[in-house]
């Protein structure tokens, strides 16, 4: 098999992107805390999202919604704190300096672990391919006839990682306030453990992203003409021509666009954000079938994606600088996608949450 074919196999394994679960500690009951104690002051860089009930999933007027965003279903959530912005390079740098942590993109690829996620008999790629690296976006030189063939705009770059977000010759110098990228699920969990935080559930993420606009397509309403003023996304023909109406070709510094009604920035576009939920194609249908309000849902019990049957995926939310109306339009607040737990790319990052319970028990 040629090296090019190995690369295609490799891309197939890791493209849709993002370990063990957080270790439990002795905890106070969440409901008791939220009912009987004063909510503590928000930690620096976070805001309080009050408890409430909302309808999760695509709204009826959203004509671009995908089937796995439906049907809408009722969810009840306790209040929680959430980061105002995506975790930045400066914040992640502090974590690495204090712990010496190495991200998955900085580690040599473990073929034995990888082949367990591949069809039996898949040959081992050449060692020159199994080197530390990550996925980079590459602009196409001509119109792409098949937008399902993601290998046309992604390439494996040895040496790409959070410190070198656009390849081995790039750096994050002068980009302290940009979102950290090339982060896998495992990397995000490690940061959370250090920071005394956790990843949001998918329901928490959408509730926070919607703010007080429960019945709209976007976090600001239904007017798509507002997109370039509010979101770092791809404008023009994807993946050929980005007109840069929003001012940025790739990631943008956090807080570059107006926040939502909760004061949260970049809940649409810039980078996809990891959540704690397993990605399961049928999960929304299962919740809706209960015909009741689900309290504090923790996601599906197992991953299920028939398009990636060998991959364990977590849900990512919010879309990225690559989302466009001609491709995925994932800056819509109900948009969701599966992300391989053990891979990373230049358009995936994360933000964290905390509860009064977590803060009281630290």
What residues fall within each predicted segment?
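Functional-site microenvironments in short loops/helix caps that host divalent-cation chemistry
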Residues: 23-29, 49, 55, 59-60, ...
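Short, solvent-exposed alpha-helical surface patches in non-cytosolic proteins
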Residues: 84, 89-96, 184-190, 206
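C-terminal motif of bacterial Sec signal peptides marking the signal peptidase cleavage site
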Residues: 17-18
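Short, conserved catalytic-motif segment at the N-terminal edge
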Residues: 54, 59-78, 168-171
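Short, structured beta-strand segments at or near domain termini in extracellular proteins/domains
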Residues: 346-361
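Sec-dependent N-terminal signal peptides
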Residues: 6-14
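N-terminal pre-domain segments of enzymes
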Residues: 24-40
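Short capping motifs at secondary-structure boundaries
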Residues: 80, 95-104, 195, 359
């Amino acid at each position: 098999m040629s090296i090019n074919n190995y690369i295609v196999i490799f891309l197939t394994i890791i493209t849709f992107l993002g370990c063990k679960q957080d270790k439990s500690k002795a905890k106070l009951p969440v409901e008791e805390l939220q009912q009987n104690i004063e909510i503590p002051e928000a930690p620096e860089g976070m805001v309080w999202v009050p408890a409430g009930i909302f309808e999760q999933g695509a709204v009826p007027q959203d004509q671009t919604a995908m089937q796995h965003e439906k049907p809408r279903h009722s969810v009840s959530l306790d209040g929680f704190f959430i980061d105002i912005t995506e975790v930045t390079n400066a914040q992640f740098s502090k974590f690495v300096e204090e712990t010496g942590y190495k991200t998955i993109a900085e580690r040599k690829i473990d073929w034995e672990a990888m082949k367990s996620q591949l069809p039996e008999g898949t040959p081992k790629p050449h060692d020159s391919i199994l080197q530390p690296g990550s996925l980079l976006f590459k602009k196409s030189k001509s119109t792409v006839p098949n937008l399902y063939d993601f290998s046309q705009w992604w390439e494996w770059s040895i040496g790409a990682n959070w410190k070198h977000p656009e390849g081995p010759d790039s750096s994050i110098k002068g980009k302290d306030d940009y979102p950290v990228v090339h982060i896998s699920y495992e990397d995000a969990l490690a940061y959370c453990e250090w920071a005394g935080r956790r990843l949001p559930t998918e329901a928490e993420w959408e509730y926070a992203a919607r703010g007080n606009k429960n019945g709209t397509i976007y976090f600001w309403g239904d007017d798509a003409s507002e997109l370039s003023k509010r979101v770092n996304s791809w404008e023009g023909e994807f993946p050929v021509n980005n007109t840069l109406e929003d001012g940025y070709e790739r990631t943008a510094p956090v807080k570059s666009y107006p926040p939502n009604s909760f004061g949260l920035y970049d809940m649409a576009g810039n980078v996809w954000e990891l959540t704690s939920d397993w990605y399961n194609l049928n999960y929304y249908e299962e919740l809706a079938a209960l015909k009741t309000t689900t309290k504090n849902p923790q996601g599906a019990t197992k991953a299920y994606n028939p398009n990636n049957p060998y991959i364990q995926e977590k849900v990512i939310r919010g879309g990225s600088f690559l989302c466009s109306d001609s491709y995925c339009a994932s800056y819509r607040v109900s948009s969701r996608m599966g992300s391989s737990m053990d891979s990373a790319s230049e358009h995936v990052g994360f933000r964290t949450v905390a509860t009064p319970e977590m803060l009281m028990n630290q």
